[in-house]
């Protein structure tokens, strides 16, 4: 599972988003079920914690050019924004709850991430 995510191209927002959406199309329902159980099952909570740490580091690596030149609070805030935009719940909201197509979900994420690029 992580091998597929690790194949995301560094610095290529559209490519990284396509990789991520592909991952969520395949694994998203499973991840959402796990997240729904994390408060009740210790081993699931541990697995989810590992996944959260992995996702943070994936964002730092994959979107490194968007983080270059930022330090301290600004870097943490930008990373947190990227983590939120690329979270499985964001995919679920756009794809499942709001009914966007896969292509429109990808376009929306690319556009939103692009907004962070110009942020101070």
Residue ranges of each PLM-predicted region?
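Amphipathic alpha-helical linker/stalk segments
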Residues: 1-16
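Alpha-helical DNA-contacting segments of helix-turn-helix folds
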Residues: 1-5, 38, 51
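Amphipathic alpha-helical packing segments from all-alpha helical-bundle domains
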Residues: 14-33, 42-69, 76-80, 107-118
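Primarily hydrophobic membrane-targeting regions of prokaryotic envelope proteins
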Residues: 18, 36, 93-95
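Short helix-capping/turn signature of helix-turn-helix
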Residues: 36-41, 85
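Short, well-ordered coil loops that connect the C-terminus of an alpha-helix to the N-terminus
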Residues: 69-72, 100
């Amino acid at each position: 599972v992580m091998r597929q995510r690790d194949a995301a191209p560094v610095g290529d927002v559209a490519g990284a988003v396509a990789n991520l959406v592909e991952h969520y199309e395949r694994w998203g329902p499973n991840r959402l079920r796990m997240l729904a159980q994390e408060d009740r099952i210790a081993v699931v909570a541990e697995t989810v914690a590992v996944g959260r740490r992995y996702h943070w580091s994936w964002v730092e690596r994959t979107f490194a050019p968007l983080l270059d030149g930022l330090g301290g609070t600004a870097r943490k805030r930008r990373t947190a924004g990227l983590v939120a935009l690329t979270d499985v719940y964001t995919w679920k909201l756009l794809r499942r709850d709001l009914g966007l197509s896969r292509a429109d979900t990808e376009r929306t994420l690319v556009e939103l991430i692009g907004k962070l690029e110009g942020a101070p």
